[in-house]
């Protein structure tokens, strides 16, 4: 009976174990990258103390998950010695109740402007199509909420749902941006939903910017269909567009900012869509009938008509392909305008990456076309609609608890 009990408890805890863990590696990585990026050396300077303070705050936040972690305790001890040795407390803001005049510190430091090579760009638009940080392009069909980008400074979460009632036809209907508390900003939240009449003009608390010597964060509202959330202190920006019942979102940020995140496997911009939800959009356009039958999709617009329409608005490359796919299988001109806006944003926000992206995609398409005649078309579209997964874990847990009650 004791063996059964132990096995059961072990199983249950393995299923429901918490996902939290010690983030000492993440804190150390951020600290080291910031030092390297700014050429900081350990000495009694205001900037080094400010970075050290942020590092110690990171360590303090993860302390309860690091009991018994030798690296955590040794690193924290060394850094606290630095804090004391360099008299970093003198750089802290003075107490409002104190009558002793101390040097007041401006704790908000803007990062140096990054070069084009150190900028990353990611975009999600249409039915939906994903351009990842590495330049890869995917077309997916996922429902529910998932982080697009998640790091120490901000989180962008997208919610996809089916708005047309057709199989595997999803699009972005909600974008949530969380700006995390930092020396340059308080915690801020922005929410955009396709159900609303237009994009909000500010954060949910009613503010539109964070005041420092210059605005560190601000909402740059253009009109009901386009808004930019600018994080000036880290040279990052989030761009949200709206067309009818659809939203699109793009993120531009330096690599050093993006790499302060934790589990990048969950982020769409880094790891992409789940394999089970990816759709071969290029083949779908070429083999329309087989795709439509396998994915239970209706062809709303003939291929030639869709191509002419997308050429008329000036789309090229992957944006042309996305436009054709969306128009063929939805017939919705709103998505045509979103693909055009997505291309325009890419050109404007990351021109260096846009040119290399077009070149790489052209080379990839040429290679794919060389092998297209060798593809066994009968093997491409099979079992396209995944069966609904059954979640066994809760039922198994209940079963084991019932078994324990009978045996004890």
Curated annotation (Swiss-Prot):
Transmembrane segments: 388-408
SS bond partners: none
Gene Ontology BP terms: BMP signaling pathway; mesodermal cell fate specification; positive regulation of multicellular organism growth; regulation of BMP signaling pathway; regulation of dauer larval development; regulation of multicellular organism growth
Membrane-topology annotation of the record: Lipid-anchor; GPI-anchor
NAD is among the record's keywords: no
Statement: the UniProt record of this protein carries the keyword Lipoprotein: yes
Ranges of the Extracellular topological domain: 23-387
Deletion phenotype: Smaller body size compared to wild-type.
Glycan attachment points: 60, 134, 183, 376
Phenotypic consequence of residue 127 to E: Rescues small body size phenotype of null mutants
Signal peptide stretch: 1-22
The protein's assembly and partners: Interacts with unc-40 (via FN6 domain), dbl-1 and sma-6.
UniProt protein name: Repulsive guidance molecule B homolog drag-1
Gene: drag-1
């Amino acid at each position: 009976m004791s063996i059964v009990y132990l096995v059961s408890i072990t199983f249950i805890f393995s299923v429901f174990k918490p996902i939290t863990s010690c983030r000492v590696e993440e804190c150390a990585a951020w600290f080291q990258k910031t030092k390297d990026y700014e050429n900081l050396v350990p000495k009694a300077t205001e900037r080094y103390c400010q970075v050290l303070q942020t590092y110690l705050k990171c360590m303090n936040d993860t302390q309860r998950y690091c009991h018994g972690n030798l690296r955590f305790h040794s690193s924290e001890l060394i850094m606290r010695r630095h804090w004391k040795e360099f008299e970093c407390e003198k750089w802290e803001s003075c107490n409002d109740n104190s009558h002793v005049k101390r040097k007041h510190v401006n704790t908000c430091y803007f990062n140096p402007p990054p070069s084009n090579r150190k900028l990353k760009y990611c975009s999600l638009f249409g039915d939906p199509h994903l351009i990842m940080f590495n330049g890869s392009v995917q077309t997916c069909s996922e429902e529910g909420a998932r982080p697009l980008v998640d790091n120490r400074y901000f989180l962008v979460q997208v919610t996809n749902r089916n708005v047309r009632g057709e199989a595997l036809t999803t699009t972005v209907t909600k974008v949530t941006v969380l700006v995390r508390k930092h020396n340059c900003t308080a915690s801020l939240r922005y929410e955009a939903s396709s159900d609303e009449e237009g994009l909000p003009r500010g954060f949910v608390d009613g503010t539109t910017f964070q005041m420092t010597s210059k605005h560190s964060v601000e909402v740059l509202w253009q009109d009901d269909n386009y808004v930019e959330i600018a994080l000036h202190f880290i040279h990052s920006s989030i761009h949200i567009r709206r067309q009818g019942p659809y939203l699109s979102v793009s993120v531009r940020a330096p690599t050093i900012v993006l790499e302060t995140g934790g589990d990048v496997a969950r982020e769409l911009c880094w790891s992409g869509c789940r394999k089970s939800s990816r759709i071969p959009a290029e083949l779908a356009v070429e083999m329309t009938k087989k795709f439509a039958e396998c994915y239970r999709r209706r062809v709303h617009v003939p291929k030639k008509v869709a191509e002419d329409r997308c050429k008329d608005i000036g789309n090229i490359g992957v944006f042309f392909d996305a436009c054709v796919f969306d128009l063929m299988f939805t017939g919705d001109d709103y998505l045509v305008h979103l693909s055009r806006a997505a291309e325009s944003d890419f050109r404007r926000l990351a021109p260096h990456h846009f040119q290399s992206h077009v070149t790489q995609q052209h080379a990839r398409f040429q290679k794919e076309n060389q092998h297209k005649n060798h593809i066994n078309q009968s093997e491409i579209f099979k079992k396209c609609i995944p069966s609904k997964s059954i979640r066994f874990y809760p039922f198994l847990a209940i079963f084991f608890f019932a078994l324990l009650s009978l045996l004890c």
